[in-house]
Amino acid sequence: HAVLEDFYRDRQREGRLPLRDDADDRAALDRVLQAQLEQFKKKERIGHPALLAVRVRRLRVDLLRLISREANDPSDPDCLPARFEHSFGPLRIAAAKSGRGASDDDSQPLHIHGIIDRIDLGPGRAVVLDYKAGRLPRYEQILAHELLDTSFQLPLYAAELTVDKSLFPIGEPPAQVTTRYYSLRQGRTTRKLLDNADMISLDPQVRQRVQGGNVEAVVFAEE
């Protein structure tokens, strides 16, 4: 994650987004990878140098593949990488009103903090990308069958973006928020995405209307 964070920040700073999969992109990756490797050596036990070198070579191959695929087949061509390891919170998750005449002030809300690996932004749109080390079939399964059942992370991230005005300081939060898992090993995002506006809405009226199909209601019930 640290290598990708520094790489995308470098490309953003240099006005080199979207990625181009050229010599400049590859040189930037090598600079960032080397800098992170030096930091790693100072902080961690590295074991046998030859084994570390093998791991670094494999990592470089994976990241070069990711850069190439993203440059040539972006998951959302209308959005650009914009925020990296984005901290958020406290995101207020309200409790359901407990009875007739109850108000939001009567409840004890949850306040959730977290870090989103990457956010891509476009006109009125935001895309959450959640980095994963594994292969895509497992994450396609989660998106298809496990959201709001055993997996709350992506819906919470998406809900955060619907109210996070820091992403659009001169305007309103994005009208459309979608989320995908991103396999770093394969350099691809899931084909399936989370784009259910009712699921991620923090509007009390939506929560009441969709009942168990809303992240705020389900997460609070689980607590």
Where are the regions a protein language model picked out?
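A residue-level signal for conserved active-site and pocket-lining positions in enzyme catalytic cores
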Residues: 1, 63, 118, 157, ...
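Short loop/turn segments at secondary-structure transitions that flank enzyme active sites
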Residues: 6, 10, 90, 135, ...
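C-terminal substrate/ligand-recognition segments
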Residues: 6-10, 128-129, 154, 179
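Active-site-adjacent bridging/hinge elements
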Residues: 33-39, 125-136, 183, 189, ...
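Metal-dependent nuclease catalytic regions and adjoining charged, substrate-binding loops involved
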Residues: 158-223
